[in-house]
Every structure is written in C-alpha cells, then in structure tokens.
Design a protein with these regions (language model features):
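Conserved beta-strand-loop-beta-strand hairpin that lines the nucleotide-binding pocket
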Residues: 1-11, 55-80
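STAS-typified acidic loop motif
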Residues: 9-23
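Conserved short strand/loop->alpha-helix "switch" segment adjacent to the catalytic nucleotide/phosphoryl-transfer site
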Residues: 20, 24-48
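Hydrophobic packing within well-folded, soluble alpha/beta domains
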Residues: 22, 50, 75-77
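Histidine-centered phosphotransfer motif of kinases
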Residues: 42-60
Length: 80
C-alpha cells in the first residue's frame, strides 16, 4: 500500500444484529485494503468479539473504527 487510507468507521446500534454488520464491514474494508485472507479473517474475528462485548455491556450505540497505522491495524469500538 503506497498511501495510508482514511480510517473506516461505522455507527452501530446496541443490538445483536450489529455483530453481523460489523463482520461484513470489516470484511469489506480488508478486501478493499487488499489484506491476505488469513489476516482478514483474524481481523473479522477480533472485531466481532469487540462489538459483541460492547453490545453486551455498553448502554448506548457504538462506533467501530478500523485504522491502518504503518504495518498494523487498529480496531476500536467506542460507546457514546
């Protein structure tokens, strides 16, 4: 990747359906960013675990962010 893409964000409701939406979002981003399949699959799993935790324990909607930082990917989930 020559240029670092902008962080990718999605707002999600505090709902069990958000876990599937997060998985699809992460899969689409990792495909667009040309990640190899094993790494992309791991990111989908990690992201869905983070969203599941927020759905279970947060009291508000949440935001999932994916960010490329040099040779690393940062996944964050914040409740509002």
């Amino acid at each position: 990747m020559a240029e670092r893409p902008e962080p990718a964000r999605i707002a999600l409701p505090r709902s069990p359906s958000s876990v599937g939406a997060a998985r699809r979002f992460i899969a689409a981003r990792t495909t667009a960013w040309s990640f190899p399949e094993p790494a992309a699959d791991q990111l989908v799993l990690i992201g869905s675990e983070l969203v599941t935790n927020s759905v279970l324990h947060a009291r508000t909607a949440l935001t999932l962010t994916l960010e490329l930082r040099n040779d690393r990917v940062r996944i964050s989930v914040k409740d509002r």
